[in-house]
Amino acid sequence: MDLLSRARKINAMLQTATGKSVNFNEMSASLRDVIRGNVYIVSRRGKLLGFAVNQEIENERMKSMLEERQFPEEYTRGLHDIRETTPNLDIESTHTVFPVENKELFKDGLTTIVPIIGGGERLGTLILGRVNESFSDDDLLLGEYGATVVGMEILHEKTEEIEMEARSKAVVQMAISSLSYSELEAIDHIFEELNGKEGLLVASKIADRVGITRSVIVNALRKLESAGVIESRSLGMKGTYIKVLNDKFLVELEKLRSR
């Protein structure tokens, strides 16, 4: 396969990912087929976002690392020192992706490190591994192109997470602002007693203790439930089961308490 055809496969990977939830394992598999080597996409903190192997590595430590999807902290810190593509590192390198305890078995193992940069910051690292054959200039070009595509997808995912956080926070703030003073007071006492994200409580007991009517509690819970912030379910004489659905709710409630 010539360079142009291989580059087009990476480009197709970007077009396929557009508008969809990112699957870094699929991206790794595409890069593996194009570069013909083992591919690991590692986040800035060492989380293994995706991987695909061309050659299986029979090593318990490596298997455990892939299952846990986490690279060692010391190794990850070392990757941050590499600021540009560094090709064909041998088994003696501290950055080798091959198990050093099996040096004889992987004495011809070569590792290439490609930083993933996006929006002016280090987002992670693309690690390529191959045995017996060094990475050519064409491979490095494709690796850097692949890292750029992966970086775009990581940025896209981060943007979506930020937008989702903002939406969740806005929903909670609107729900809380819809409560009357007495309803807000009731909610404060309810979740103080609940002391967590879910649990069982008896509304009438809280109403008697705080000195508010049961209807105030019911209305307050109904407003939060209609906003999708909580779910509640009556269990008859046992009380009412309440579960927080929006993680931002308890945070915002705590802010109100500290004012």
From Swiss-Prot:
Principal cellular location given in the protein's record: cytoplasm
Gene Ontology biological-process annotations: negative regulation of DNA-templated transcription
Summary of the function given for this chain in its UniProt record: DNA-binding global transcriptional regulator which is involved in the adaptive response to starvation and acts by directly or indirectly controlling the expression of numerous genes in response to nutrient availability. During rapid exponential growth, CodY is highly active and represses genes whose products allow adaptation to nutrient depletion.
Keywords: Cytoplasm, DNA-binding, Phosphoprotein, Repressor, Transcription, Transcription regulation
Listed name of the protein: Global transcriptional regulator CodY
Gene that encodes the chain: codY
One MF term in the entry's GO annotations: DNA binding
Residue range(s) of DNA binding per entry: 203-222
Phylogenetic placement of the source organism: Bacteria, Bacillati, Bacillota, Bacilli, Bacillales
Organism: Oceanobacillus iheyensis (strain DSM 14371 / CIP 107618 / JCM 11309 / KCTC 3954 / HTE831)
UniProt keyword annotation of Metal-binding present: no
Family from the record: Belongs to the CodY family.
Modified residues (Phosphoserine): S215
A cellular component annotation (GO) from this entry: cytoplasm
Pfam families hit by this protein: CodY, HTH_CodY
Region named GAF domain: 1-155
Location in the cell: Cytoplasm
InterPro entries: CodY, GAF-like_dom_sf, GTP_trans_reg_CodY_C, Transc_reg_CodY_N, WH-like_DNA-bd_sf, WH_DNA-bd_sf
